[in-house]
Regions:
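Conserved beta-strand elements of the Class I
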Residues: 20-22, 99
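Structured, beta-strand-rich domain cores
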Residues: 90, 97-101
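Gly/Ala-rich beta-loop-alpha elbow adjacent to hydrolase catalytic centers
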Residues: 100-111
Length: 299
């Protein structure tokens, strides 16, 4: 259906320009499904945002052991496939303005692409003027204390070892309180930082394995040291865990995994308020995407 904005542009003899929105899905989601695609659809349907979706093609997998696909890549391999596909698409469309939306594993892939855009010498730095902004949900690479205007939760940092710095103002990081993938302690207390570092160390080891489980389960197993899975993860640690902070690390991971449903803060962004006005994470993301799509182009 033709939007009012398109009709108005036609009446004025102007070209109606739509921004591409690259969507980076979560683990085991098919490209073009899940939170990122919901956000794009919401901005189009509710706000008539001048955008169209470009689903990033990747397996969005977490390994082959226990998976119906014997060739399913590990999490780390899956993320890199997504990164390379997105970079290739952007390079192939040098005159196309674009936004990005990513969730969970997809948020990590999106963040790596963002680094290529905002970092001098990055593969996409020369096209940074085409980037209008973006949204992450439950981002493992979230910059410490970064979120978005008016958001309730910004403490801590993403669980990954490599994270964003100097995140552009047009990019918001949405997290639910207690979502361990997007929020581990970062200080200022030394014990908090050490606990966060323990969790990150186990996570970085877990994502290298070809295991069809969620990362939180692998992290908890490694922290508690129970079972064969713990041995596999611990063997990949770059350095020993901090014993003093181990109890706090286990508590954080256990609270995340033991919720009903397990990892609830990470999978309920359509229900939990993230803003003082009661908007959920998905509603806030829709509004932000609509706003950056409608903003005048930078000079």
């Amino acid at each position: 259906m033709t939007s009012f904005a398109e009709l108005l542009a036609g009446r004025r003899g102007l070209e109606f320009v739509k921004h591409a929105v690259l969507t980076f899905a979560g683990t085991w989601a098919k490209p073009g499904t899940g939170y990122p695609s919901w956000i794009v659809a919401g901005a189009i349907d509710a706000l008539e945002a001048p955008i169209y979706e470009v689903p990033v093609q990747a397996p969005w997998s977490f390994g082959f052991i226990g998976s119906p696909d014997p060739k399913a890549p590990s999490y780390e391999e899956s993320v890199q496939i997504a990164v390379e596909w997105a970079i290739a698409w952007i390079l192939a469309h040098p005159f196309q303005t674009f936004a990005m939306v990513g969730y969970s594993q997809g948020a990590e892939a999106m963040s790596r692409v963002l680094l290529e855009i905002i970092t001098p010498g990055g593969r996409l730095y020369h096209l940074r003027h085409n980037f209008i902004g973006g949204v992450t949900v439950g981002n493992p690479m979230r910059e410490e204390n970064h979120s978005g205007p008016g958001l309730l939760h910004s403490a801590g940092r993403g669980i990954a070892a490599k994270r964003l710095t100097n995140t552009p103002d047009t990019v918001v990081d949405i997290i639910n309180e207690g979502d361990m993938y997007g929020q581990v302690p970062a200080g200022p207390k030394v014990l908090d930082k050490q606990a966060g570092d323990n969790i990150t160390a186990c996570y970085m080891a877990a994502v290298q394995l070809g295991l069809d489980i969620n990362a939180a389960t692998a992290v908890l197993a490694a922290l508690t040291g129970k079972g064969g899975l713990a041995e596999q993860v611990l063997e990949l640690l770059a350095k020993p865990l901090n014993v003093v902070a181990l109890g706090k690390s286990i508590t954080i991971a256990l609270q995340f995994v033991a919720q009903n449903p397990p990892t609830a803060p990470h999978i309920t962004y359509e229900w939990r308020p993230v803003h003082a006005d009661g908007r959920t994470g998905i509603q806030y993301a829709v509004d932000h995407l609509g706003a950056i799509a409608a903003a005048p182009a930078a000079a």
